[in-house]
């Protein structure tokens, strides 16, 4: 699993850092860029309070930034510190898709193993609607710009893209546009049990995922949900293999923009993907 290293530093222990497969420094999130978080006291159960070092029933405020990060040198030092503390685990940096080139300059200087970019199109149960619908760069343009920047500076840092990617065709297109990997959130929740009631923040999720209510949580069958997520991922992998075959490739990582077309003139203009009306000679 990927351990998310956030400003509040919840659950940051040597054991957790070293038992993770990778560590991701969360600088930003696509659906609420530049914001922290607020967990109302009514959701802070004894279990959550113990994990977060708070009192049960006490509001938990998450800061919007790491107080120790004020320069690119600070970010580089944090990457090095986590790499050492974790025993050499891969270290990533997650940013919201905003001032991409400027932010990527800082990230590349910090020398992480991967950079995750979260574009508009993603979701979370706790982001304000007005921000979710009006901020950050749409994922397709964010990916294109990021790939161009990393190529221009000859960086070999892996690029992970997320934000609204739901099914295997989305994943295949993202890989073709230059992503090394894709990350999902909502798609996995839907595979598990989510029926998109869109009331996550209320704590009254009727399928038992986003709630601390014992009666509602009892409705969530974890083993069955885990199997559904595994099925979704396995089917997605098989479908990605099919996309590779039908385009004449041995691997999905051989896909490129040459394998894509679009009906959208703006996408064609800004991403280099050919318009469907343009002859390929």
Stretch-by-stretch model annotation:
Residues 8, 30, 53, 80, ...:
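Generic secondary-structure signature for well-ordered alpha-helical cores
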Residues 193, 220-281:
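C-terminal extensions of enzymes
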Residues 14-32, 150-153, 157-162, 166, ...:
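Electropositive, surface-exposed helix/loop patches at the edges of structured domains
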Residues 36, 45-51, 57-58, 63-66, ...:
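Generic secondary-structure boundary/loop-capping signal
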Residues 1-81, 85-92, 96-108:
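Active-site-facing alpha/beta catalytic cores
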Residues 61-217:
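Glycine-rich phosphate/ribose-binding loops and adjacent secondary-structure elements
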Residues 4-21, 141-149, 207-219, 279-281:
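Short, basic, helix/turn surface patches
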Residues 49, 53-56, 71, 205, ...:
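Short capping/connector residues at structural and topological boundaries
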């Amino acid at each position: 699993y990927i351990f998310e290293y956030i400003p509040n530093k919840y659950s940051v222990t040597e054991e957790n850092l070293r038992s993770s497969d990778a560590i991701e420094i969360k600088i930003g999130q696509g659906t609420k860029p530049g914001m922290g978080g607020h967990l109302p006291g009514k959701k802070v159960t004894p279990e959550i309070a113990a994990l977060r070092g708070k009192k049960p029933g006490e509001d938990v405020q998450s800061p919007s930034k790491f107080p120790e990060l004020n320069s690119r040198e600070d970010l580089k030092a944090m990457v090095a510190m986590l790499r050492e503390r974790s025993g050499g685990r891969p270290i990533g940096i997650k940013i919201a898709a905003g001032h991409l080139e400027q932010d990527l300059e800082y990230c590349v200087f910090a020398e992480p193993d991967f950079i995750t970019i979260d574009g508009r199109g993603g979701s979370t149960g706790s982001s304000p609607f007005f921000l979710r619908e009006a901020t950050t760069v749409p994922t397709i343009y964010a990916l294109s710009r990021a790939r161009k920047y990393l190529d221009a500076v000859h960086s070999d840092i892996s690029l992970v893209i997320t934000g609204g990617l739901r099914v295997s065709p989305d994943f295949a297109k993202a890989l073709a546009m230059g992503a090394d990997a894709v990350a999902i959130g909502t798609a996995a929740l839907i595979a598990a049990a989510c029926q998109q009631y869109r009331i996550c923040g209320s704590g009254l999720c009727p399928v038992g995922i986003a709630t601390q209510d014992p009666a509602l949580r009892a409705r969530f069958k974890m083993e069955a949900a885990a199997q559904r997520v595994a099925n979704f991922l396995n089917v997605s992998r098989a479908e990605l293999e099919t996309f590779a075959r039908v385009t004449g490739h041995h691997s999905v990582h051989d896909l490129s923009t040459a394998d894509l077309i679009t009906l959208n003139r703006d996408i064609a203009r800004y991403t280099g993907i050919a318009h469907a009306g343009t002859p390929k000679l």
